[in-house]
């Protein structure tokens, strides 16, 4: 049954074996991070491209982590099971919605550490020993841009190649589309 309130909704982090050759799932489910024991909730687990680490978000409960001040990132070493609470990366404001670089040494994430209202893109480096280093905000050509922009960067995603469109292309297409009708 669903809890009476979203504040009681919590998700554990589990894994199950998968046989890619046969397209079948294993029978055993392993709980890697137990929501009941940890008194929190996990979301957005993403394995590094090299398969060594799992980066995920932890919040007090399980909905819309960017809205939770306490939300932070945690890093699990998939070889040892060790969990790093990333004290050099996390702030006292929402840190969530992450993505890995193709080389597994960098990750981008959204943080509200600046003003507490708007998510900004930060980058953190993960060295060969798995130690995360102090993040920095996405540089802007105008240093005041983030202070003057009333937009939030919620889900940064890293790409190895340039995207074949720009914001004005999306805006133009959006204006041409007919809105979905609800019946």
Positions of the model-derived regions?
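Sequence signature of WD/YWTD-type beta-propeller architectures
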Residues: 1-183
């Amino acid at each position: 049954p669903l809890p009476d309130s979203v504040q009681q909704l919590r998700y554990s982090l589990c894994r199950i074996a998968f046989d890619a050759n046969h397209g079948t799932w294993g029978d055993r489910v392993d709980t890697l991070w137990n929501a009941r024991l940890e008194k929190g909730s996990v979301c957005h687990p993403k394995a590094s491209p090299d398969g060594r680490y799992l980066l995920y978000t932890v919040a007090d409960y399980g909905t819309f982590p960017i809205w939770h001040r306490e939300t932070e990132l945690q890093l699990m070493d998939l070889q040892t099971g060790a969990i790093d609470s990333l004290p050099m990366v996390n702030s006292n404001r929402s840190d969530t919605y992450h993505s890995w670089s193709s080389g597994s040494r960098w990750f981008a994430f959204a943080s509200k550490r600046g003003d507490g209202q708007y998510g900004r893109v930060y980058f953190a480096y993960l060295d060969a020993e798995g130690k995360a280093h102090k993040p920095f905000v996405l540089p802007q050509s105008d240093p005041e841009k983030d202070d003057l922009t009333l937009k939030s960067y919620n889900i940064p995603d890293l790409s190895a190649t340039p995207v074949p469109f720009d914001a004005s292309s999306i805006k133009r297409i959006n204006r041409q589309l007919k809105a979905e009708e609800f019946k």
